[in-house]
Amino acid sequence: METVQMSLDLQPEDTKANIECSSPDYEIKCFSHNQFAPQIERLKIEKKYIHIVEETETFNRKLVSYQANKNQSIHNWIRYKEGFSSELVQNLIEEFGLSKGDTILDPFLGSGTTSLTAKMLGINSIGIDILPISHIAFEPKSFIFEYNLEELDRAYKEIYEISPTKIEQKFNHLSITEGAFPEETENDLLFFTHWDNNSQYSYQTKTLIKLILVSILEEISYTRKDGQYLRWDYRSQKVIETNKKRLEQGKEPIKTILDKGELPTVKESLLNTLLTIKEDIKEIQQKCLPNESVHELIKDSALNALPKINDNTFDAVITSPPYCNRYDYTRTYALELAYLGVDEKKIRELRQAQLSCTVENKSKLKQLKDYYHSLFLESRYAEIERLVTGNEVLNEINYALRKRWENGEVNNKGILSMVDGYFTELTFIFYELFRTCKPGAKVAFVNDNVRYAGEIIPVDFLSTKIAEDIGFKPIKIYTLKQRKGNSSQQMGKYGRVALRKSITIWEKP
């Protein structure tokens, strides 16, 4: 959204006198390093919501990340680092008092932790996600009570006895995944993919094997996920060719320390993973009884899906949106997406369709306006747009970042549009959540605060303000004892500021 001009009077005199730009606790007392930009509105919401903050050990860093799922049956079938843990979802379900027959929503489904945890407890769920990696992560897990163990044993035996042969099919790489596998590994991967597609096993078993093939891609490749990028083994053609060009140009070769050692074969990884998953399925089928809960996966973005859902549908929402941290899931999971048939054009479309969290995202306002018009919801769109343009806190943040950009402190102008787009789109999502939640429904959002160019963005409190403006009642903001750090570049220039990792809890009256 266009921002309004802000007063350069940074804060009232009594506030100025008491500012501390470094504080050991979770309260933020200085949002703009060296008071460079206005921070009155951010200080106001800090004061308004600080009394509902509860520092907690019940929800720790392990629970609000994938770490606690690493040893959890089902949830560890595919590594999805951006997710949260099943234990977190169980704790929130208990706190919200949900029971069998209730319906829970996760508008950013990821690897499906919310829906799968609900399934085990007999609670209905709807999950929304646009990324194909999310779809393949969730669907095979949702079949947990449907698998035929004898059939899985037969599939295991057949794979064990197979010797892969040369296949003419080629892996449809993206430019950033080219050369990810040794030649023989790539051939074997395609061989087993073709075998799975053409086998006579049930849909459930075939989909499970597809999940396993996706889950082992990193393990059998020259790549390793590192933040939002792929790191490359020194033996990969990408590193070899890059260094060759650098030497021809008289430059030093890239110094890479990644050495993954001997890579397992596709067959080894497939068999080992299938064996582990078979044991998980056997144990869960023995310990747990199937229930009649219903679970729906909507393969779309939350921005598109939510406006079409009926009023008063959900008893709770538990989710974690992509963070406003420039991480691009289409790059992090490029290898998996390429394997699933996503080409360069589709990658760009997926990147733009996701919640704006990368510097490449463009404004979705015209697209959203046209979409709401197509659904005959023009008045709803206009109401949401008014909430965005009237958001004084977001206007202040936009102004502060623009001033930092003009001062040469923002290293990518796309950060400005990303931050504005992020909260603009969350306003649409929060509005639709309020409409689709039943009275009394509680909403939990897991998110991190961020800082760009010395400007702190209180994601937790700003999200809570937006939610309250829409009609939600703020209940509590859990903050973790473990704070989030800053990039080395920011610490070097602006000092270290501990940022909150929070779980915001709201209720529809």
Curated annotation (Swiss-Prot):
PROSITE patterns xref list: N4_MTASE
Protein name: Type II methyltransferase M.BsoBI
Any one Gene Ontology molecular-function term assigned to this protein's record: site-specific DNA-methyltransferase (cytosine-N4-specific) activity
Family designation: Belongs to the N(4)/N(6)-methyltransferase family. N(4) subfamily.
Alphabetic keyword roster: DNA-binding, Methyltransferase, Restriction system, S-adenosyl-L-methionine, Transferase
Its EC number(s): 2.1.1.113
Lineage, opening ranks: Bacteria, Bacillati, Bacillota, Bacilli, Bacillales
GO biological process terms, semicolon-separated: DNA restriction-modification system; methylation
SUPFAM superfamilies: S-adenosyl-L-methionine-dependent methyltransferases
Catalysed reaction, written as an equation: a 2'-deoxycytidine in DNA + S-adenosyl-L-methionine = an N(4)-methyl-2'-deoxycytidine in DNA + S-adenosyl-L-homocysteine + H(+)
